[in-house]
């Protein structure tokens, strides 16, 4: 096994919740990995615009897995896209909106724009905080392009709604994506990683990946070297033997030893 690709979830993994900028160390590590012929992949539910801004100093050294695998970018070009069936996306969006007791706001993701159905509960501020392109809509039918992901933002937390939505939309890979988000998508991170590996002729055994939540499981399950964050839920820490508080700690040792 020779690591050729390193994938990392962002929020809750490489970027702790509430932080807006990455540490300088990760940029130095990505540059050194690139010099050694190892590609770094931010693997996130965020859109491309947000990820490219976040990784601006090293963006040309990265391949970007966006929208949980719904869209893949390399060298500023979309190299793969996995949209949801339109009728299913609209049905899910309407369900998340109407069955969240007035406590949820809905985001429908296009290739590089977030379409927001908001109630003034905080979603808009969060989307502005991470730097997404966005547009306010009032109905899912207003989205003028293919939809890659449908999410609900629950401003009081996901706990009361996980059992309501996750089993119901299992066909759309419904999963908790953070303290306030539940995501649905036909794609998932493993589809994105497989697309990257196929395009770049990389064996899955030669991939290292980091994650902290249930929407990272599909990615962690297929790579040769998966790491779960120390702050992840107990079932995830039990599932994966490799734990770390920070991806940078693992990468620092990896670069020393290789």
Q: What function would you assign to each model-found segment?
A:
Residues 37-41, 60-62, 148-150, 205-207, ...:
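Short active-site oxyanion
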Residues 4-19, 220:
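Asp-based phosphoryl-transfer active-site loop
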Residues 21-122:
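Active-site phosphate-binding/coordination module
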Residues 57-60, 68, 167-170, 222-223, ...:
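Short, structured coil segments at secondary-structure junctions
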Residues 1-5, 23, 182-258:
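Mg2+-dependent phosphoryl-transfer enzymes with acidic/Ser/Thr/Gly-rich catalytic loops
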Residues 99-210, 214-219, 231:
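Conserved acidic, metal-coordinating active-site core of Asp-based
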Residues 51-55, 162, 219, 236:
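Hydrophobic packing residues within well-ordered alpha-helices of enzyme cores
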Residues 61-67, 82, 126-128, 174-175, ...:
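Short hydrophobic/aromatic-enriched beta-strand-loop microsegments
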């Amino acid at each position: 096994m020779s690591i050729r690709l390193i994938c990392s979830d962002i929020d809750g993994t490489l970027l702790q919740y509430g932080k807006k900028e990455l540490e300088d160390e990760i940029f130095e590590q990505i540059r050194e990995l690139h010099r050694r012929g190892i590609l770094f992949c931010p693997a996130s539910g965020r859109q491309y615009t947000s990820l490219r801004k976040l990784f601006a100093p090293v963006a040309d050294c990265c391949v970007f897995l966006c929208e949980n695998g719904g869209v893949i970018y390399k060298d500023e070009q979309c190299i793969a896209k996995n949209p949801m069936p339109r009728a299913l996306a609209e049905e899910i969006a309407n369900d998340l909106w109407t069955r969240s007791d007035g406590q949820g706001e809905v985001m429908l993701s296009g290739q590089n724009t977030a379409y927001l159905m908001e109630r003034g509960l905080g979603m808009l501020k969060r989307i502005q905080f991470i730097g997404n392109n966005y547009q306010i809509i009032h109905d899912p039918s207003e989205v003028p392009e293919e939809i890659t992901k449908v999410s609900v933002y629950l401003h009081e937390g996901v706990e009361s709604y996980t059992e309501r939505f996750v089993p119901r939309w299992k066909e759309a890979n419904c999963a908790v994506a953070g303290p306030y988000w539940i995501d649905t998508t036909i794609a998932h991170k493993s589809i994105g990683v497989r697309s990257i590996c196929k395009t770049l002729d990389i064996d899955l055994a030669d991939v290292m990946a980091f994650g902290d939540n249930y929407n990272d499981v599909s990615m962690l399950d297929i790579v040769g070297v998966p790491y779960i964050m120390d702050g992840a839920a107990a079932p995830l820490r039990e599932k994966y033997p490799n734990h770390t508080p920070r991806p940078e700690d693992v990468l620092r040792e990896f670069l020393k030893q290789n």
